[in-house]
């Protein structure tokens, strides 16, 4: 596997989606949880970024994960409703996954191998964000406590790069 475009994932409805459908877009791939202390800030700021840059080719791909303190116990339909109702935000939501361990998503295994974390590669908490360029290559990994607005410079640079 050489880029995120090589992966197929399941959307919130359980349908197969090829990430090659996003060729030419700049992606923020993020593991999300509804009951995390980081939820409000991340969803609010991701929505703001998408509102500004979607027209330029930015997409947010959200992968619910319940591996961290059980902070995403809901089903995908409830997660989608929560995010839409509370934040007026509609990221592209995918099926709930594991981001670490024996049952980890192949996509997140690839992301971690391409851009390891501080001290070790495992995803440490909810809202670890990967910025992916228009070519499907990972540009940068941002930790859970990095505010999405602090990614804006890197997002602008990525959006400026044409294929």
Curated annotation (Swiss-Prot):
GO terms for molecular function: glutathione peroxidase activity; peroxidase activity; phospholipid-hydroperoxide glutathione peroxidase activity. It is found in: Cytoplasm. It catalyses: 2 glutathione + H2O2 = glutathione disulfide + 2 H2O. GO terms for cellular component: cytosol; nucleus. The keyword Cytoplasm applies. It comes from the Eukaryota. Its main location: cytoplasm. The active site is at 36. Its EC number is 1.11.1.9. GO terms for biological process: cellular response to reactive oxygen species; innate immune response; regulation of peptide transport. InterPro entries: Glutathione_peroxidase (IPR000889), GPX_AS (IPR029759), GPX_CS (IPR029760), Thioredoxin-like_sf (IPR036249), Thioredoxin_domain (IPR013766). Keywords: Cytoplasm, Oxidoreductase, Peroxidase. It is an enzyme of class 1 (oxidoreductase). PANTHER family: GLUTATHIONE PEROXIDASE (PTHR11592), GLUTATHIONE PEROXIDASE 1 (PTHR11592:SF49). Belongs to the glutathione peroxidase family. May constitute a glutathione peroxidase-like protective system against oxidative stresses. This is Glutathione peroxidase 1.
């Amino acid at each position: 596997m050489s880029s995120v475009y090589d992966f197929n994932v399941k959307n919130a409805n359980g349908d197969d989606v090829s990430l090659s459908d996003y060729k030419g877009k700049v992606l923020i791939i993020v593991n999300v949880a509804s009951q995390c202390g980081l939820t409000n800030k991340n969803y609010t700021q991701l929505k703001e970024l998408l509102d500004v840059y979607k027209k330029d080719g930015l997409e947010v791909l959200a992968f619910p994960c319940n591996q961290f303190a059980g902070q995403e116990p809901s089903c995908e339909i409830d997660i989608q409703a929560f995010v839409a109702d509370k934040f007026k935000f509609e990221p592209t939501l995918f099926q709930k996954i594991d981001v670490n361990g024996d049952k980890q998503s192949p996509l997140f295994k690839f992301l971690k191998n391409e851009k390891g974390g501080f001290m070790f590669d495992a995803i440490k908490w909810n809202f670890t964000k990967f910025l992916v360029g228009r070519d499907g290559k990972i540009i940068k990994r941002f930790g859970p406590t990095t505010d999405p607005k602090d990614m804006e410079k890197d997002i602008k640079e990525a959006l400026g790069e044409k294929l």
